[in-house]
């Protein structure tokens, strides 16, 4: 099929192009309670073809881009027609000219990690066993679950001779936990792992069952006021994603962010801790065939790397790093238990928690929180929290070993 696409590109007189081939083998398992409802194997194979069109507009060089998806079942004529349409579309979708990444070539890179040691079917089986091994809370149960175990081959080719290939395995899915008494409550959770970390899923389910049982007895008695807010897991990650977004070339070039290398992102330090954050490479190459590696993005509260794909990086005059999907933040200097010695509001579940990376404001409506007033812990629901990362970053505390952060924020009871 690669040869068919290349021949069609030549016939369509498309000189600049990139092909991204994806071949996936997926084992899917679906459960209702503990009963396996359905099991299936799914194989998909597709080619995402990007075509580029260079031209001038008002005397300035432009580069247009368009893309189409091709599957092996399509005929040579169908492929040619799609590519001609993409070429035509690219001539109307121009941006100021930018250079594409340099040529990359390598031997196929085998999948690494513990997931590569077992089949997709076996991985799905083990994660299912781990998920239901935790389903032993007398107050709550796993209502339903879905597990998807994938083995993916990615190959990227370009007109400049680029030809890289790598394999990657991962497991993701979702489950719903339910508690029926004294109030019927259901809570949705998702998960994703790139190693055979069954213990992590088991712990996640155990926590989810405990929290849904607490949600069923939670009371809407959160007073309005200002609290030491503790966030963990996905909620903490959502807040910290602000720093990843603001240091991206896609935010800096249009002027949405004024950050540059060396910018202090915590200019008003009080009793908080300096951030140290790292972009984590989950694959060896980006979709543009840019080599990916771990990069320090925030070091001691200052920007160390601006990051992004080829186009925005070219406009800024920086090295293209590729687009990252994961990051880590170094642990803080206090333990989670120390963090909870002072009065706090530990919000563990929201109906919708969001971070606005343009303004730095974040917040959401509370579904479940633990309120400690200095003497006792109450399980509460209702109300909302909102705040600005810019206003509280100087007092942010991070803990170890759990991924949690504490800031001081106002809460409002509706």
Predicted regions and their residues:
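Short beta-strand elements
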Residues: 45-59, 164-194, 297-299, 366-373
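Short His/Asp/Glu-rich catalytic/ion-coordination signatures at enzyme active sites or charged loops
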Residues: 63-74, 103-120, 174-178, 183-202
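Acidic low-complexity segments
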Residues: 5-7, 15-28, 76-166, 206-234
